[in-house]
Amino acid sequence: MSRQWLFSTNHKDIGTLYFIFGAWAGMVGTSLSILIRAELGHPGAFIGDDQIYNVIVTAHAFIMIFFMVMPIMIGGFGNWLVPLMLGAPDMAFPRMNNMSFWMLPPSLTLLISSSMVENGAGTGWTVYPPLSSGIAHAGASVDLAIFSLHLAGISSILGAVNFITTVINMRAPGITLDRMPLFVWSVVITAVLLLLSLPVLAGAITMLLTDRNLNTSFFDPAGGGEPNLYQHLFWFFGHPEVYILILPGFGMISHIITQESGKKETFGNLGMIYAMLAIGLLGFIVWAHHMFTVGMDVDTRAYFTSATMIIAVPTGIKIFSWLATMHGTQLTYSPAMLWAFGFVFLFTVGGLTGVVLANSSIDIVLHDTYYVVAHFHYVLSMGAVFAIMAGFIHWYPLLTGLTMNPNWLKLQFAMMFVGVNLTFFPQHFLGLAGMPRRYSDFPDSYLAWNIVSSLGSTISLFAILYFLFIIWESMITQRTPAFPMQLSSSIEWYHTLPPAEHTYAELPLLTNNF
């Protein structure tokens, strides 16, 4: 047991560990979100003061981003599928792969500890000084959160190096870069973004650590520092990070739509690759659109507004290519396809509110209101999460060799779809009416939509529990699939379900008939 799970060098076992860890962290993060909506479901205090509320909000963000979405998408799906899709026997650095995973549980432990000592880190996930300085947040909480981020960051950097090396060196003969599956492309682009952005975050939080403990003043004006420098460094990481969260989802959705539509390949395959490359590149030159309210020159604001809007172009290319892939087919309303439909529609809605927020003059008004919360939850809670659900259902027979009950899955999709939309759509109205983020209480005029939002979160919770029940049911009944339902979009299906522990003992050769 310990050889298989603690010291594993097998990409499938490590991928499974990532899935289990991500699911567990996801349940913690979901519980925190339920606490947030319970607090906001009625006026007046419920859980406590704003410090504990902001600790919950901060932990919710960190856990969902660093311990749920990234481990599942990059660690889980990436580890499982990239070697299988490349025809590689394993990852390039199998032991480093294991270390990448085992840095996450200590990291999560540090983060949870940070909320249990002193007053907790109630800084928001951005950890801006001076709120995160040694004066406003005395005690060890923020320091523990910083160490947690360092560990998670090292884990991601090592994983990124591993994926990049694997994709460069371990492709089977015949898999040229232009014929590499879109999911593999999405993971390698994500890995490059991680490699370039995380060191900047590490620098920023290390400077914050020394400001708090070693009497430096990088971000303290009293010592000649500049609090704004932190924001620039943080968002230079923070904006690529949001593309890191969604790009593997793009790759998965491309595979699912192509395969379920019965098409030979995705519409505009090469264009899809260039679109992802463009999104990755542009993601690095738009960071200050998170900072329109800090007082930038009008020409700077004009540049960041324009550059941000340009990102909508490659994103639009991807949306329309997905629609073109579905075009002309007899649509199958299979569970995975339903999630993919939901992804395309809701991600588009989230993208449109993003284009609204890109306008610096409008953003001055909407900054730090619930409009922003609604925007990024549409692209995360209904983009990244829907992609994870679609991918998990689609590749579940490959991962486990079992099938889930498709009718139950459709019901579960309907519950989740209603739940998340009921939760986040009203938040657009709250934001337009001026309700600010990160406050535990609000004027009574905002009550009605907050009640609707909290009701939606309860429905989402039951949908998640139902999904766990569906997985449990499939595992105790042990229904095995006879064969994959459609022509496969990639070579990972040319194995037993589930694949043998070691695949591609003899390297495959891909011919033009592929």
Swiss-Prot record:
Mg(2+) binds at residues 367-368. Its cofactor is heme; Cu cation. Binds 2 heme A groups non-covalently per subunit. Binds a copper B center. Heme a3 binds at residue 375. It holds the Pfam family COX1. Fe(II)-heme a binds at residues 60, 377. Gene3D superfamilies: Cytochrome c oxidase-like, subunit I domain. It is an enzyme of class 7 (translocase). Keywords: Calcium, Copper, Electron transport, Heme, Iron, Magnesium, Membrane, Metal-binding, Mitochondrion, Mitochondrion inner membrane, Respiratory chain, Translocase, Transmembrane, Transmembrane helix, Transport. It is a multi-pass membrane protein. Cu cation binds at residues 239, 289-290. There is a cross-link at residues 239-243 (1'-histidyl-3'-tyrosine (His-Tyr)). It catalyses: 4 Fe(II)-[cytochrome c] + O2 + 8 H(+)(in) = 4 Fe(III)-[cytochrome c] + 2 H2O + 4 H(+)(out). Component of the cytochrome c oxidase, the last enzyme in the mitochondrial electron transport chain which drives oxidative phosphorylation. The respiratory chain contains 3 multisubunit complexes succinate dehydrogenase (complex II, CII), ubiquinol-cytochrome c oxidoreductase (cytochrome b-c1 complex, complex III, CIII) and cytochrome c oxidase (complex IV, CIV), that cooperate to transfer electrons derived from NADH and succinate to molecular oxygen, creating an electrochemical gradient over the inner membrane that drives transmembrane transport and the ATP synthase. This is Cytochrome c oxidase subunit 1. It comes from Anopheles quadrimaculatus (Common malaria mosquito). The lineage of its organism: Eukaryota, Metazoa, Ecdysozoa, Arthropoda, Hexapoda.
